[in-house]
């Protein structure tokens, strides 16, 4: 029996959480990661491997952080220059965290939001990354079985982060492409009514702003609509703002903190902000998650719960010094935004040349790519078939829209900031060859007699690189040939 199998004896011995598959590891979202892990692309060691485009990571400005650390060795307690503070930092720290870190974080959060709002360091609660912070807030607000309304498409791992251990439920607020997936009051009310009809107690609304996977920002009117909605129903509003410094073009980012300060009759105790340094600074391995709540009880309880997932004092010490360097922070935020904008513009421009459009976005480290025209029919089954071809034959790990609970098949999230320029070139060349091959086969299909064309209506999904002409001088553009009947990963169909 393998690690992924649970026999009858263990089903009787273990807890419901232990035997439950609520983690979602068997979803298409995580299956794509497994495909990459089993066959990772490397320009020299494995040029025919899978390119990771399913990881929402920002590596474009990583060198700036490395340079700062080189210039400030005293910021680390593990260097000769910083060793004198080793004992005081390495000894026991309570769950409030280092005061200098909370102060630096509050200042940084304000700077990211253009200085239009200030944050109180005493309200900052730390957790083990955004995942831990998210779960802690849910534990504070909901009992098992309670529900949260979440506009879809939404972050695929919310099903794990928000539901698995808390036993809370998610009710999607369905948004569609006709208005660029914007949240409306009508959609909120429909979802709320649906929860009531299912005898579920709605405890709040959860949004990501900027949006993952859309890469768009909420405007002030929509944020005010959300605040009004939760005020009327006396439920909570959780705003995940972990991508707030990834905005690279207009409109600028508006934090819910600004709306809270400006709106009259706002019930502040219902508003909670999630933040992290994983996306804005590109430091997911540091596991820095932040809860900023306007509710005193939530602040107190979340701080006590943070004992189960603290940020190491060594990490706090280093980041306190870095985030307190205002000149560095100003330069980093400006340059990071510039680099993200340039990468996004280049990536979408090349896709557009191939006839592939993306949702117009202004933030994030990904694009919401529209491949509806490549589906053999407008179903999620067809989307999964196309996704398997992209994973197994084109060798790109992109995430299918169904993983994000979108209502329209054919959308894919594609990350562009977790790789260097050369890898981007390889990925774009693979996409170009794939689309070109499909278009050629489609042209041939149109030229066939009607009966033959009917028999060949699956040409769109029977793609193989074996018939391509390769540039022998550029082996990086030549993925493994793989039979469409031998999928590398087991994907879930909807």
Swiss-Prot record:
One MF term in the entry's GO annotations: 1-aminocyclopropane-1-carboxylate synthase activity
UniProt-listed Enzyme Commission number(s): 4.4.1.14
Record key words, sorted: Ethylene biosynthesis, Fruit ripening, Lyase, Pyridoxal phosphate, S-adenosyl-L-methionine
Pfam annotation, one family: Aminotran_1_2
Annotated catalysed reactions: S-adenosyl-L-methionine = 1-aminocyclopropane-1-carboxylate + S-methyl-5'-thioadenosine + H(+)
Primary enzyme class: lyase
GO biological process: ethylene biosynthetic process; fruit ripening
Biased composition (Polar residues): 475-484
Cofactor(s) recorded in Swiss-Prot or TrEMBL: pyridoxal 5'-phosphate
Residue numbers spanned by region Disordered: 474-494
Pathway note: Alkene biosynthesis; ethylene biosynthesis via S-adenosyl-L-methionine; ethylene from S-adenosyl-L-methionine: step 1/2
Transmembrane segments: none
UniProt cross-references to Gene3D superfamilies, sorted A to Z: Aspartate Aminotransferase, domain 1 (3.90.1150.10), Type I PLP-dependent aspartate aminotransferase-like (Major domain) (3.40.640.10)
UniProt xrefs under CDD domains: AAT_like
Inducing stimuli: Hormones, such as auxin, environmental factors, such as mechanical wounding and a number of chemicals.
Sites bearing N6-(pyridoxal phosphate)lysine, chain numbering: 279
Biological role stated in the UniProt entry: Catalyzes the formation of 1-aminocyclopropane-1-carboxylate, a direct precursor of ethylene in higher plants.
Family statement drawn from the similarity comment of this UniProt entry: Belongs to the class-I pyridoxal-phosphate-dependent aminotransferase family.
Subunit structure, interactors included: Homodimer.
Protein name: 1-aminocyclopropane-1-carboxylate synthase 2
Native source species: Cucurbita pepo (Vegetable marrow)
Primary gene name: ACS2
């Amino acid at each position: 029996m393998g690690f992924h199998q649970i026999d009858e004896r263990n089903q009787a011995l273990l807890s419901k959480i232990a035997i439950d598959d609520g983690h979602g590891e068997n979803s298409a979202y995580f299956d794509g990661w497994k495909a990459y892990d089993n066959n990772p692309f490397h320009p020299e060691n494995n040029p025919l491997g899978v390119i990771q485009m399913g990881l929402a990571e920002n590596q474009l400005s990583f060198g700036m952080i490395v340079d700062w650390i080189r210039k400030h060795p005293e910021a680390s307690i593990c260097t000769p220059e910083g060793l004198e503070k080793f004992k005081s930092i390495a000894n026991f720290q309570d769950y409030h965290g280092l005061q200098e870190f909370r102060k630096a974080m509050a200042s940084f959060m304000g700077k990211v939001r253009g200085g239009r709002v200030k944050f109180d360091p005493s309200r900052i609660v730390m957790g083990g990354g955004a995942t831990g912070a998210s779960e802690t807030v849910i534990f504070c607000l909901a009992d098992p079985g309670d529900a949260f309304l979440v506009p879809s498409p939404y972050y695929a791992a919310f099903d794990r982060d928000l539901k698995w251990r808390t036993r809370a439920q998610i009710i999607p607020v369905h948004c569609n492409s006709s208005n660029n997936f914007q949240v409306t009051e009508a959609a909120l009310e429909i979802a709320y009514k649906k929860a009531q009809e299912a005898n579920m107690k709605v405890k709040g609304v959860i949004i990501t702003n900027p949006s993952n996977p859309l890469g768009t920002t909420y405007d002030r009117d929509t944020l005010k609509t959300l605040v009004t909605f939760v005020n009327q129903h006396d439920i909570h509003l959780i705003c995940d703002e972990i991508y707030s410094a990834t905005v690279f073009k207009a409109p600028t980012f508006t934090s819910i903190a600004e709306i809270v300060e400006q709106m009259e009759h706002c019930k502040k105790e219902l508003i909670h902000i999630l933040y992290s340094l994983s996306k804005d600074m590109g430091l997911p391995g540091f596991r820095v998650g932040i809860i900023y709540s306007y509710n005193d009880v939530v602040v107190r309880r979340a701080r006590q719960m943070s004992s189960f997932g603290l940020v190491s004092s060594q990490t706090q010490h280093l980041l306190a010094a870095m985030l307190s360097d205002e000149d560095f922070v100003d330069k980093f935020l400006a340059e990071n935004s510039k680099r993200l904008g340039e990468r996004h513009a280049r990536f979408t421009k090349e896709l557009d040349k191939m006839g592939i459009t993306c949702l117009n976005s202004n933030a994030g480290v990904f694009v919401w790519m529209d491949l509806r025209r490549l589906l053999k029919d407008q179903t999620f089954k067809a989307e999964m078939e196309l996704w398997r071809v992209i994973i197994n034959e084109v060798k790109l790990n992109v995430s299918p829209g169904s993983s994000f609970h979108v209502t329209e098949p054919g959308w894919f999230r594609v990350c562009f900031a977790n790789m260097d320029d050369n890898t981007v070139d390889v990925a774009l060349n693979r996409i170009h060859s794939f689309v070109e091959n499909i278009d050629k086969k489609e042209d041939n299909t149109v030229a066939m007699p009607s009966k033959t064309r009917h028999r060949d209506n699956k040409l769109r999904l029977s793609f193989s690189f074996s018939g391509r002409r390769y540039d022998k001088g550029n082996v990086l553009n030549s993925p493994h040939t793989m039979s469409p009947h031998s999928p590398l990963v087991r994907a879930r169909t909807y």
